Regions:
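Structural motif
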Residues: 1, 15-17, 67-69, 105-108, ...
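N-terminal glycine-rich phosphate/adenylate-binding segment common to multiple enzyme folds
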Residues: 1-26, 133-137
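Short acidic, glycine/serine/threonine-rich loops at helix termini
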Residues: 2-5, 79-84, 119-122, 139-143
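A glycine- and small-aliphatic-rich helix-loop capping segment at beta-alpha/alpha-beta transitions
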Residues: 3-12, 84-91, 145-155
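Solvent-exposed alpha-helices and their adjacent loops that cap or buttress functional pockets
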Residues: 9, 32, 61-62, 98-102, ...
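Glycine-rich phosphate/diphosphate-binding loop of Rossmann-like nucleotide-binding domains
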Residues: 17-23, 27-110
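Active-site loops and adjacent core secondary-structure elements that bind or stabilize anionic groups
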Residues: 113
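Glycine-rich phosphate/nucleotide-binding loop
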Residues: 119-186
Length: 186
């Protein structure tokens, strides 16, 4: 979603999505016909990127011996989110199921609405894999509900195991300025 292109239009018309393959093949879909001003967004993800994300999640779960939950909204976004679900399921079945079973940990997919309800009622102790935007929003909600956004860390793990730890969104700067003023931080 963060490498998406956006556009605002100010008149009636039709938006289309067109893919032109290197082979010369072309696919065009009508996004929507509108009767007035509208806002549009086009986004993409590559199978390679989704697969790398899935592998990183599964390996992180194995390394930490914790269950892995993956959630999206494939009932609404049948193709886009459905592709994430398909790749996660495929990676699990082909490459990680035996390791998960040996460790006594589980992997499961559920719709993001169901996952939110489960997470709020849970005691934690699992890894919740989400697409980028969903993860940004849900991690902020969880950290605020169960502590403080300022105490949250963000861990980025690449498929080769390279790991980067960073502060949560905007909290360090805000708290630093409070500290300089002698104000209490969390």
């Amino acid at each position: 979603m963060y490498k998406a292109v956006d556009m605002v239009t100010d008149e009636p018309g039709t938006a289309t999505l067109t893919f032109k393959g290197e082979s010369g093949a072309e696919k065009t879909l009508t996004v929507q016909t509108v009767s007035g001003p509208a806002v549009w967004q086009g986004q993409h993800n590559t199978e390679k990127s989704i697969r790398a994300f899935a592998k990183s999640c599964f390996q992180f779960a194995i390394d930490n011996k914790q269950d892995l939950w993956f959630s999206a909204k494939d009932t609404i976004s049948k193709v886009y989110d459905g592709e994430f679900k398909r790749i996660f399921d495929e990676e699990y079945e082909q490459n990680y199921k035996a390791s998960f079973e040996a460790l006594g940990i589980t992997y499961f997919y559920t719709l993001i609405d169901d996952a939110v309800a489960r997470v709020i009622r849970s005691k934690g102790g699992f890894i919740w894999a989400l697409k980028n935007y969903d993860g940004d929003v849900m991690s902020d909600m969880i950290s605020t509900a169960f502590g403080s956004l300022a105490m949250m860390t963000s861990v980025l793990v690449s498929p080769d195991g390279t790991t980067e730890f960073e502060a949560a969104h905007g909290t360090v700067t805000r708290h630093y300025y409070k500290h300089l003023k002698g104000e209490e931080t969390s």
